[in-house]
Amino acid sequence: MNCRSEVLEVSVEGRQVEEAMLAVLHTVLLHRSTGKFHYKKEGTYSIGTVGIQDVDCDFIDFTYVRVSSEELDRALRKVVGEFKDALRNSGGDGLGQMSLEFYQKKKSRWPFSDECIPWEVWTVKVHVVALATEQERQICREKVGEKLCEKIINIVEVMSRHEYLPKMPTQSEVDNVFDTGLRDVQPYLYKISFQITEALGTSVTTTMRRLIKDTLAL
């Protein structure tokens, strides 16, 4: 199975990390979730509806759409909060990345554990920039909103391509493809990881600083 890999890069102020990451992760999971399956008999099932809601960011001029699931939101906020704290405590330049990996399980014979086979991975590289003035922060608020909008549009375009998705499972195999542990939504199986890095490249950060500098010069 070929695993599709997508990489995004963002440059944000420290207080924008959480909102930017939640916007990206929620957007991806919005397109990788279904309503709960309700099986009538093997081979016959109905799919529940998925509620959605708008989220207005406090530190970015941006509004994104997420699945209306408090359980899913709490799970994402927990790991994003850990990532934000790790960035803040790194003592470096605020470089890091988060990865959202979708996978399906392949049953193995006893005594071996099930094999997890990834089929799509989203990686978001993050560079936190330090700003000196409130004027710079206001400009960054607007510019990050514009850049984040571009990233979200890119995600939607990628999701619209007719590429691999796991086939709909039978009732006995649904847990090999979907996370059935949530009460109100059923995302494809996924896991999120993050790391703090020493070197990430400066192209995105340089672009953001240039945008702020050019705007101040107007």
UniProtKB/Swiss-Prot annotation:
Record keywords, A-Z: Autophagy, Cytoplasm
Region called Important for interaction with ATG13, residue ranges: 152-156
GO BP: autophagosome assembly; negative regulation of cell population proliferation; positive regulation of autophagy
Key word Oxidoreductase present: no
Cellular component GO terms, alphabetical: Atg1/ULK1 kinase complex; phagophore assembly site
Protein's job: Autophagy factor required for autophagosome formation. Stabilizes ATG13, protecting it from proteasomal degradation.
Subunit and partners: Interacts with ATG13. Associates with a complex composed of ATG13, ULK1 and RB1CC1; the association with this complex requires the presence of ATG13.
Name listed for the protein in its UniProt record: Autophagy-related protein 101
Highest classification ranks of the organism: Eukaryota, Metazoa, Chordata, Craniata, Vertebrata
